[in-house]
């Protein structure tokens, strides 16, 4: 089974409010080997996260670093083409998220994000409790997470996606590409 880690890159605060782009990146693993990396750009606080993720090369299952990318850009789980595990290493504060959404966004993202956060499932793994929202069987999702919890609670595909996307976006920013 091919498993992807999905994460976004760094962006400066001045990009908030749709004033810039950052990286959305997929790292595809077969067992513990990286077999593919793909990325594209998303608008910070935009609404293109779902379409960009659907255009990336991914594995059979995607482990997403949360539901929001590039600020409050987001993915709509019901529109994703692949199987997914939306992963949180700790429970998000729904009150803070709701307050931020109410202040800045009055569109579908509010309802989608609040619905997912409200319906996270706590899963006890060998490395501690995590919170997920998935379209997989819960036992299968737990097995995938535990298989890739090599060093800590965060699955290896997410750790690597984070490192590469942060480094890539910082590099592209330094070259004034984003």
Curated annotation (Swiss-Prot):
It comes from Sulfurisphaera tokodaii (strain DSM 16993 / JCM 10545 / NBRC 100140 / 7). It comes from the Archaea. This is UPF0215 protein STK_03040. Belongs to the UPF0215 family. Pfam families: DUF99 (PF01949).
């Amino acid at each position: 089974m091919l498993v992807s880690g999905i994460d976004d890159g760094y962006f400066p605060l001045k990009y908030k409010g749709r004033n810039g782009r950052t990286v959305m990146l997929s790292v595809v693993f077969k067992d513990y080997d990286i077999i593919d990396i793909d990325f594209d750009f998303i608008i910070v606080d935009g609404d293109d996260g779902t379409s960009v993720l659907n255009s990336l090369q991914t594995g059979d299952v995607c482990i997403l670093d949360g539901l929001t990318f590039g600020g409050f850009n987001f993915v709509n789980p019901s529109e994703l083409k692949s199987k997914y595990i939306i992963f949180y290493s700790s429970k998000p504060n729904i009150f803070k998220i709701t307050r931020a959404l109410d202040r800045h966004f009055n569109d579908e993202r509010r309802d989608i994000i609040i619905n997912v956060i409200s319906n996270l499932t706590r899963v006890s793994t060998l490395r501690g409790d995590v919170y997920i929202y998935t379209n997989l069987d819960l036992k299968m999702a737990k097995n995938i997470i535990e298989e890739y919890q090599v060093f800590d609670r965060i699955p290896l595909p997410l750790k690597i996606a984070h490192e590469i996307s942060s480094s890539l976006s910082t590099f592209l920013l330094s070259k004034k590409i984003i």
